[in-house]
Amino acid sequence: MNKYFKVFFFVLLTHALKSSLIFGQATLQKGLSLDIDKDSTATDRLVVKHLDSDKQGYKVYTFKKEGWEYVNVKHVYFGERLLRVGRDNDMRCDFVHYVKVFWKGDVAPFFIKMNYYNWAWVSTRLHFKLNPDLTWTEVTVLTLDENAEQGFTTLFKQKLDEFASQVGDDVLAKYKPFVDDPNKKRFDLKATDEKEETSKKKYVLMVVVVVVFVVVASLVVFLVKFCLK
């Protein structure tokens, strides 16, 4: 009888450790870009992609009253649909324009899709809440000669900047400037790596699960032995 309880305890412990590892990994996803799957039923499903080549050309622009500014996306939280950006100051904007460039084989044309997002400030946390108020636009950029005098990268970035400026002019007509509230507490968004903190939480959870199962298993064994007497 005692042997069966040991086997049962081992199976439960293995399952608990596996579940805690999966749970810990699912709490935080890191990446360099943000995508929204518009074609599936879950239109606001966030997808993080790690980019290794400029040919994939992902950029994120924030539109402020002063103009355009590049923002590097640091963390995406899937469960809460919150986005953290690697900035040293407040990200004060009403629109975010996300440019995604599709590379067809080894040559152009490029297909650029630009999405419009509205940011809502979450006052209790150092994040902005992502509201997928989406407008979808697709344009074709003419083939760029990689051997041109200015170089491929320079021309490509110029095309992106020109395209962003054109869209910005259309948005400006509807733009509502961010209004500062002197009584509102300011938050600073800092570029932080929360992977270490997540790992600590994962291991703490594992320890707690192990302790709980040891106590429960010991209690079950004790009760069985007591009943068999």
Curated annotation (Swiss-Prot):
The keyword Transmembrane helix applies. It is a single-pass membrane protein. Residues 20-203 are extracellular. It is found in: Membrane. The keyword Transmembrane applies. Keywords: Membrane, Signal, Transmembrane, Transmembrane helix. Residues 1-19 form the signal peptide. Residues 225-229 are cytoplasmic. The chain crosses the membrane at residues 204-224. Its main location: membrane. One of its GO terms (cellular component) is membrane. This is 23 kDa piroplasm membrane protein. It comes from Theileria annulata.
